[in-house]
Structure formats: structure tokens, C-alpha cells
């Protein structure tokens, strides 16, 4: 079963204590899907804050080949959708809200378009429903080239990665996946499978005959991001008839980390409106 964390009243629940509440308050549930190289834990502080007043239950999910999930030999949006639908069925979710960042944002959009009956409101964080041509190869090759047998600490890894990955904040984010297991460092993300699946992850694999979605949707994006721009904003209208946009000044792709207060305020207003 896919790994997930439940936050309510600012607290983390790891059992079925909230099952009854989940069944009777589904319009107040928000599922959060992280981006590539991310994990549910990255969203812990935001999830706690969103759930603090008791009006929202936040369920943050480790997507396949990331975080605490078991590694699998395949990775695609269709498989991730299957994982999430299985989770919905396990929790007896009939209708819910979705928030996805980057890869998780594409997953949330695809779920909303493919299984609209499950989705109440949709929040997309800094990704567009398009095929991206950007070459992510340098990042994943740098991680795969790192000889973990020579690594004694995260600082060692950071020094080596800094030769090819100049952005320190990006390195710090990536190195969150480096974990010490039985005295040896290992990656907490299935890099080989991710590399093999990169073409699928850069695409937006939706069927042409999909119906335009009328659900209430919000795209929140960083003014300094290369992923959502004035040029590709029009792509959302092809799929989402009822979408609004919020640009966060001074933020890039990791807008929820760079401008957490404004990000929190924006999605809180949207969910509670």
C-alpha cells in the first residue's frame, strides 16, 4: 500500500484514528502530491499549518519510487494514478481536493481529467499541462555518478555535487534523499527507474478525447519560474474551464518553500471560499 501521512489539528496521525472523520467530512480533505525527487515529508510543515484549525484534513502522499514507498521497476503517470485510485478506495474516498507540485501537479491534473468524479477542487503548483523539452539529465546523471562508497557525510556529497549542480538550494533539496542505512548512504529515490522514465515525466500524457474539466481549479506559480510562463498559461484553458491564476512575486519553482506564508494564504482562501 502506498505510504501517506494524515494531518489534523496540526498533528500527525499514522493510524486509523481519523477514519470516521474522513468518511463524514470528505469535502474538507486535501491530498498533497510532491514533485520529482520530493517526498511527503517535504510538505510536513505546510500540512500541519493547513490542518491547524481543524477545518481541513491533509493527507500527504509518498509517490511511487520516492520516500518511504517500495521501489518499483516502472514509473509513469498512469501507474501513479492507479496507485492513488487504490489509495482512494482503501480510504473510501468518494470526492476530495488535490494539491500537486511539479510532477505531483501533473499527476493531480491528470487525475482530475481522467477521474473527475473523485475531485472537488484542484490546486496546481508551478507546472503546466504541456510536454517539457528541458533536459533534466544533468541533475539525475550527477546523482547517479556520485560514488556513495566514498561518502562519509552529506557535506562530502554536497562538495562533489557542487561541481555540476551550482544552485546550493537545489543541492540541499536533492540531498534530503540521501539517507544513512546500516552505516552506508543510500538514495531514498529510485534514480535508475526515474531516469528511464524521464520522457514520460516530462510529458503530459492525456488522451485527446478527454472532456474539458469544469471543476474549480487554481494554478499558483512563481514569477521567476521557467515552468509556468505567460506563454504557456493558455495551455490550462484547453483542459480547465474554471481555472484561476495566482503569480507569486519573488518566487521560483519551489514557491511553497520560498514564500510559504503567501502560498499558505492563497490555497487557504481557495479551499475555504
Language-model region placement:
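Alpha/beta-hydrolase fold catalytic core
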Residues: 1-31, 52-56, 93-94, 271-273
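Active-site loop/oxyanion-hole signature of alpha/beta-hydrolase fold enzymes
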Residues: 10, 47, 57-99, 265-268
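Conserved HGGG/HGGXW glycine-rich cap/lid loop of the alpha/beta-hydrolase fold
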Residues: 25-70
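Gly/Ala-rich beta-loop-alpha elbow adjacent to hydrolase catalytic centers
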Residues: 100, 104, 108
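Flexible "cap/lid" loop of the alpha/beta hydrolase fold
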Residues: 110-113, 120-151
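Conserved alpha/beta-hydrolase catalytic His-Asp/Glu region
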Residues: 134, 149-203
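Conserved serine/cysteine hydrolase catalytic core
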Residues: 183-239, 244-247
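Catalytic histidine-centered segment of alpha/beta-hydrolase-like enzymes
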Residues: 251-260
Amino acid at each position: 500500500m502506498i505510504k501517506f501521512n494524515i494531518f489534523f489539528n496540526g498533528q500527525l496521525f499514522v493510524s486509523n484514528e481519523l477514519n470516521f472523520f474522513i468518511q463524514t467530512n470528505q469535502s474538507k480533505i486535501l491530498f498533497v502530491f510532491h514533485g520529482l525527487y520530493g517526498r511527503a515529508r517535504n510538505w510536513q510543515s505546510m500540512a500541519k499549518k493547513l490542518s491547524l484549525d481543524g477545518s481541513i484534513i491533509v493527507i500527504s502522499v509518498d509517490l511511487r519510487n520516492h520516500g518511504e514507498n517500495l521501489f518499483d521497476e516502472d514509473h509513469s503517470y498512469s501507474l501513479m494514478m492507479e496507485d492513488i485510485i487504490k489509495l482512494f478506495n482503501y480510504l473510501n474516498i468518494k470526492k476530495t481536493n488535490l494539491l500537486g507540485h511539479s510532477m505531483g501537479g501533473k499527476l493531480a491534473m491528470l487525475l482530475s481529467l481522467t477521474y473527475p468524479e473523485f475531485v472537488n477542487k484542484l490546486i496546481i503548483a508551478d507546472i503546466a499541462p504541456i510536454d517539457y523539452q528541458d533536459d533534466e539529465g544533468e541533475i539525475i546523471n550527477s546523482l547517479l555518478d556520485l560514488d556513495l562508497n566514498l561518502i562519509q557525510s552529506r557535506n562530502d556529497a554536497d562538495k562533489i555535487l557542487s561541481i555540476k549542480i551550482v544552485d546550493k538550494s537545489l543541492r540541499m533539496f536533492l540531498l534530503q534523499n540521501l539517507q544513512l542505512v546500516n552505516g552506508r548512504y543510500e538514495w531514498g529515490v529510485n534514480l535508475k527507474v526515474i531516469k528511464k522514465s524521464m520522457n514520460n515525466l516530462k510529458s503530459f500524457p492525456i488522451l485527446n478525447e478527454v472532456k474539458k474539466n469544469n471543476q474549480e481549479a487554481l494554478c499558483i506559480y512563481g514569477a521567476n519560474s521557467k515552468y509556468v510562463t505567460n506563454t504557456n498559461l493558455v495551455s490550462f484553458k484547453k483542459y480547465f474551464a474554471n481555472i484561476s491564476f495566482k503569480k507569486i512575486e519573488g518566487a521560483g519553482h519551489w514557491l511553497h518553500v520560498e514564500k510559504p506564508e503567501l502560498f499558505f494564504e492563497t490555497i487557504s482562501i481557495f479551499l475555504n471560499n
